[in-house]
Amino acid sequence: MFVKKGDKVRVIAGKDKGTEAVVLKALPKVNKVVVEGVAIIKKHQKPSTENPQGAIVEKEAPIHASNVQVLDKNGVAGRVGYKVVDGKKVRYNKKSGEVLD
């Protein structure tokens, strides 16, 4: 998976298109990512001992990894490629050529 936790990304599809935010969680088995402030859903929680009233909680839902582009340090969005630098496999931005890792 080309996106990692902590990457700054731009959403390129969906209702939050154009939003730039940080990846909170990567889910490689289902090829999805949770992005801060994107795809907010309302989750209804049952009453419990900690929360006797119950509540409606807003949280981020996962979106497909193909709907985001990774930004480099200069804010250029592009596809991610892999190359070997000094014996290590690193990710780089194909548009700007800048190493991401």
Swiss-Prot record:
GO terms for cellular component: ribonucleoprotein complex; ribosome. GO terms for biological process: translation. Part of the 50S ribosomal subunit. One of its GO terms (molecular function) is structural constituent of ribosome. PANTHER family: MITOCHONDRIAL RIBOSOMAL PROTEIN L24 (PTHR12903). This is Large ribosomal subunit protein uL24. NCBIfam families: rplX_bact. One of two assembly initiator proteins, it binds directly to the 5'-end of the 23S rRNA, where it nucleates assembly of the 50S subunit. It comes from Streptococcus thermophilus (strain ATCC BAA-250 / LMG 18311). It comes from the Bacteria. Belongs to the universal ribosomal protein uL24 family. Keywords: Ribonucleoprotein, Ribosomal protein, RNA-binding, rRNA-binding. Pfam families: KOW (PF00467), ribosomal_L24 (PF17136).
